[in-house]
């Protein structure tokens, strides 16, 4: 176990499935690791309340941050409010191994400050159309893992997963991506394996 927890940033546009992924990760990882969560919303603590309501973790392990402005700023240019939440969790739970930091919904230009996140997951969803991967932006091109979510909606919105696969490979080079459906859990094992492998986590 390292002296500092692994911090995993989870970003992506509004409605892409960040909170659903955070919930799924908590449910799968809470028995393996000493785990906590920070969520970001502009004017509310809605995502934190959702996680508490769904018993993702004990309530005291979840901190909801109200950014009061552009969610991008709170995870990149001035991450102090999030860094304070991380410090608070570290003080509250000595020996923390993993902190998930979920950003507020933002556009394709959002990225995490390296001061705040050791690994970044960027979540997009199929319902926005199969053109999204080729639009690029730091989240799509530079995140450690791109999660293409809600693949069950592809036939309903006329999106081609083959096109998204091709464009994701072209935009990301050697960086990995995964197709997922949080309703069924598809892709979750791959996401967890990535976090454990890249974050050098060893389950108790």
From Swiss-Prot:
Q: Alphabetically, which GO biological process terms does the record hold?
A: urea catabolic process
Give any GO molecular function from the UniProt entry: nickel cation binding
Top-level taxon in the UniProt lineage: Bacteria
The keyword Cytoplasm is assigned to this record: yes
Identify the keywords attached in UniProt to this record, alphabetized. Answer: Chaperone, Cytoplasm, GTP-binding, Nickel insertion, Nucleotide-binding
SUBUNIT field: Homodimer. UreD, UreF and UreG form a complex that acts as a GTP-hydrolysis-dependent molecular chaperone, activating the urease apoprotein by helping to assemble the nickel containing metallocenter of UreC. The UreE protein probably delivers the nickel.
What is the name of the protein in this document? Urease accessory protein UreG
Q: Which organism is it from?
A: Pseudomonas aeruginosa (strain ATCC 15692 / DSM 22644 / CIP 104116 / JCM 14847 / LMG 12228 / 1C / PRS 101 / PAO1)
